Each structure stands twice: as C-alpha cells, then as structure tokens.
Amino acid sequence: MLAPKKVKFRKMQKGRMNGIAYRGSTVSFGEYGLKVLEPAWITARQIEAARVAIMRHAKKGCKLWIRIFPDKPITRKPAETRMGKGKGNPEFWVAVVKPGRILFELSGVSEEIAKEAFELASHKLPVKTKFVKRQESFV
C-alpha cells in the first residue's frame, strides 16, 4: 500500500477541503482518466483496491498512472479511552482530493475497456467519479 517513507511531522491537523482542484485536473500521461466530482479523503487501501480492479480488467499491455498519493496521517485514540491525554497515534494514510482531480490515468487499451475498468474502480472509491478522455491542446 502507498504511504510516505519519511515525514517531517507524525501528526497533522484535520484541515478543510474547500474549492476545486486546479492542479492535477487534466489527463497528462495516459489517454483516459478517472476524475473526482466531490471532495473526500481517499485512503491508501481504497487506492490499492481501485488499482487492483483496474489492472485485473485491463489485463496486459496497458499502462496505469496513479495521480494521487496518501500523504496525510489520520490518528485514532484506542477504544474505551477517556477524552484528553493528547492526540491519538497515526492509524492510516489518506489523500485529500478536491472536485476535478484526476485519480488514475490509463493507456494502451480501447476506450470501452478503459471505461469498464474505471467503472469497476469507482465502486471501490467513496466518491462520485467521471470518465474523461485526453484533450489535445494546441499551443
């Protein structure tokens, strides 16, 4: 599963997920992408489950890019512990995603297979998603 190798601080504040994603909102590497439509925390386990679902459906000859990384630690206090006595220990890692962010990109497969693979992956994620194609920009 994805997790940072080393962090400057073990614990992090909760934060807010206001606004939309400006960075990472276009398909940059592959031909097809899976775009998020609502803000959420996506855990490392959910990312891995979606990755496995995509790779099982797409088979060999495809390339998958994971465009998000879980870099935020989420802490939990032990069960039946009274309030106070400090913040709990880090339990798992999440990626903070805002609407418009591309989660996965895929190339080397047909559009139908990519659509089906992303549909399977979206069932593993706690957010509404949309299938997008690469837009060729003329600069």
From Swiss-Prot:
Keywords: Ribonucleoprotein, Ribosomal protein, RNA-binding, rRNA-binding, tRNA-binding
One example of a Gene Ontology biological process annotation: translation
Family from the record: Belongs to the universal ribosomal protein uL16 family.
UniProt xrefs under InterPro entries: Ribosomal_uL16 (IPR047873), Ribosomal_uL16_bact-type (IPR000114), Ribosomal_uL16_CS (IPR020798), Ribosomal_uL16_dom (IPR016180), Ribosomal_uL16_sf (IPR036920)
Organism whose genome encodes this protein: Thermodesulfovibrio yellowstonii (strain ATCC 51303 / DSM 11347 / YP87)
Matching Pfam families: Ribosomal_L16 (PF00252)
Subunit note: Part of the 50S ribosomal subunit.
Superkingdom of the source species: Bacteria
Signal peptide, first to last residue: none
A GO CC term attached to the entry: cytosolic large ribosomal subunit
Protein's name in the database: Large ribosomal subunit protein uL16
Alphabetical list of CDD domains matching this protein: Ribosomal_L16_L10e
UniProt cross-references to SUPFAM superfamilies, sorted A to Z: Ribosomal protein L16p/L10e (SSF54686)
Function description: Binds 23S rRNA and is also seen to make contacts with the A and possibly P site tRNAs.
GO molecular function: rRNA binding; structural constituent of ribosome; tRNA binding
